[in-house]
């Protein structure tokens, strides 16, 4: 499965807040880290950041936790 920047993907990590949600691949790290794929979502999660009204809308995943949407 070749995932590249800009692809729409569905999250398949069951313990993730974003499980079964669709997001857009923002970047892919090739240095060999465990979760190299950064996925950006339209909505924000439940983590509020001090001084902002929203939460976080990106998360890192392994390629094996993603499927094309």
From Swiss-Prot:
Subcellular location: Cellular thylakoid membrane
Keywords, in A-Z order: Membrane, Photosynthesis, Photosystem I, Thylakoid
GO BP annotation list: photosynthesis
Domain of life: Bacteria
GO cellular component terms attached to this protein's record: photosystem I reaction center; plasma membrane-derived thylakoid membrane
Family annotation (SUPFAM superfamilies): Electron transport accessory proteins (SSF50090)
Homology family: Belongs to the PsaE family.
Function: Stabilizes the interaction between PsaC and the PSI core, assists the docking of the ferredoxin to PSI and interacts with ferredoxin-NADP oxidoreductase.
Protein name: Photosystem I reaction center subunit IV
Organism, scientific name: Synechococcus sp. (strain WH7803)
């Amino acid at each position: 499965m070749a995932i590249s920047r800009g692809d729409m993907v569905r999250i398949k990590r069951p313990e993730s807040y974003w499980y079964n949600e669709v997001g857009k691949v923002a970047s892919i790290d090739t240095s060999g880290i465990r979760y190299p794929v950064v996925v950006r979502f339209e909505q924000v999660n439940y983590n509020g950041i001090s001084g902002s009204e929203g939460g976080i809308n990106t998360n890192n995943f392994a390629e094996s936790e993603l499927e094309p949407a």
